[in-house]
Amino acid sequence: MDERYRNDLVTAAEVGMKNAFAILNNFPVGAAVLTSRGQIYQGCNTQSVISGMGVCAERSAIDHAVACGEYVFDAIAVVSKLEVPIAPCGMCLQYIGEFSQVAGHDIHILMVGSTGNIRESSIQKMLPVIFGPLDLGIDLSRFRL
């Protein structure tokens, strides 16, 4: 991952965490994605009293970028108030994996604990086999730069 973006990406994820709507479990999570154009988009988890209606921070950040016309991501950061860095859930890994197919390359994943300790990985390491749009023969070229 390009070091010049690392701090900005983590800071954006931390801001996202502060905006989280974690009304059920008081467990705010923030995320931020870095696009191949160098833009950063943040997201946060939101919860609802209706089961299944919440949104994870990672998907929120990706959807924020998509709403702004960005589809190609190089990295994503995830932060929470726990000292131990948390990993994206399975649903978020699938979502990130599908966008790695759009990008045509691996997506770096930074997991950051509240004390600043960072665990690094990538979507290919965390979800090495993915069923995604390419398996359905979908042409993703219109979403690339």
Task: Report the location of each language-model feature.
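Alpha-helix C-terminal capping segments
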Residues: 34, 63-70
